């Protein structure tokens, strides 16, 4: 049985560096996605040059707002693993 800490385990497979989407959170309120982005930019200066997208999605009838970054070339692995090490949600897909 996987523990809840698994969401913060680093990605071990280097193939994840080719993933083009890095999701930094999923929120019930759009404003929370915007606030999270501002906080992450303060904590991680390398994010200041990035432009996020907030994607509205419906899961089991509930609306969520996903905070994501896109990159055609990937390259998110190192940053995502650093975020996970700091217990910040980060999914590569």
Q: Where are these predicted regions, by residue range?
A:
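Extracytoplasmic
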Residues: 2-17, 28-93
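A short beta-strand micro-motif
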Residues: 22-24
